[in-house]
Amino acid sequence: MTPRLEDARILMYSHDTFGLGHLRRCREIAHALVAAYRGLSVMIISGTTIAGAFDYRVRVDFVKIPSVIKLRNGEYQSMAQHTSLEDTLEMRRAIIRQTAQSFHPDIFITDKEPMGLHGEIEETLAFLKSQGTHLVLGLRDVMDAPELLGPEWARKDVLRKIETYYDRIWVYGPEGFHDPLAGLPVPEAVTARVRYTGFLRRAIPKMGTPAHRPADGYLLVTTGGGGDGADLFRAVFAAHRHDPGIGRTLAVLGPYLPARERAELLAEAETLPNVETIEFDNRLEELVAGASGVVGMGGYNTFCEILSFDRPALIVPRTQPRLEQAIRAERAAELGLVRMMPAEDTVDPAAFAAALRALPDAPRPSKSRAAAKAGFMALDGQAQIARDVGEWLMAPRQPALRAVQS
């Protein structure tokens, strides 16, 4: 029987400046929690422009904050043409703070950015800490190379602030796969709060109907939001021109692919009889499940879907502005979970075509004895998260006596 938690509330923060990964991860966790506990409500604060394009379960809702986009050089800009970044950030801070004050969450979960975009949630964290709210930081299995992440966090004094505010740090991966904080001067108090949840299992959604129902047996090419995916799509299309016998390929371009590159790719795809392109599908899980192989860049959500549906995969990771995808792909390839191809090797159409042709017959992740022995295929992240949440919400709440001084 599903336990009932009367009027329990969880607020999640997803800064969403590049791609769809943060919102999709928050949504997956939110759906698992409301399924585990009747009476629980989850609100997601999201900055993505297409938050409303996804289906949400009953008792899961979202608050849209003004959108900011991360450029390829790592800088940020407001997506409102006539609003400065500073003004946009101030609006975001105000909405986040007001939502926290009005929603009265029992638990606040931050996705990936400990203090939010440009520190926009620090004031809210201090307020919630003073109210006795349980504060949780959720981190991907891989953040970035320590030589890149370390200086960035040092400038922002992030580790001290994590120690000050957060009660628990979830790592959304299994212990032993990768330590996202490796190489950083992590305080012992922070290390003691870390819990590895395992990867987040994906399933075919029960809500709504898919926008696209291709027959099974296609290669699926996905780069997530698509903001930096043009080079991979060009390489796939060049491979098809070199070898038209690769077979049916479905390319999901992504809603954030720049308009000029989108137009060029759509025009090129029209000349390739075995290539179909779509912009977006909010049920990507169904497309992954039906594919004979998946070609992607190795973002967290795509990787979890590859494992969940046990699809042969070829990963071509990006290396700018972060090394996250490359680190994950190298580790997964080492374990035999995926095949990896450096981006510079895909510029050879013959070599890339051969890799695409071979992909459907490549070993599936479930064939990796090393990963199975280590427990990396358990994919039980949602269950571990739900256990933690249940323990906190069923325990007597102890309000803090004073506000935290930042």
Question: At which residue positions do the language-model features occur?
Answer:
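Conserved nucleotide-sugar phosphate-binding/catalytic loop shared by glycosyltransferases and other
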Residues: 6-14, 32-87, 91-93
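A short, glycine/small-residue-rich beta-strand->loop->alpha-helix junction that serves as a flexible
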Residues: 14-27, 51, 229-230
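Conserved nucleotide-sugar donor-interacting segment of glycosyltransferase catalytic cores
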Residues: 97-163
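A nucleotide-sugar donor-handling region in carbohydrate enzymes
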Residues: 139-231, 256-259
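Donor-nucleotide binding loops and adjacent catalytic segments primarily
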Residues: 184, 199-293, 345
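A donor-sugar binding/catalytic signature common to diverse glycosyltransferases
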Residues: 283-327
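C-terminal amphipathic helix plus adjacent low-complexity
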Residues: 350-406
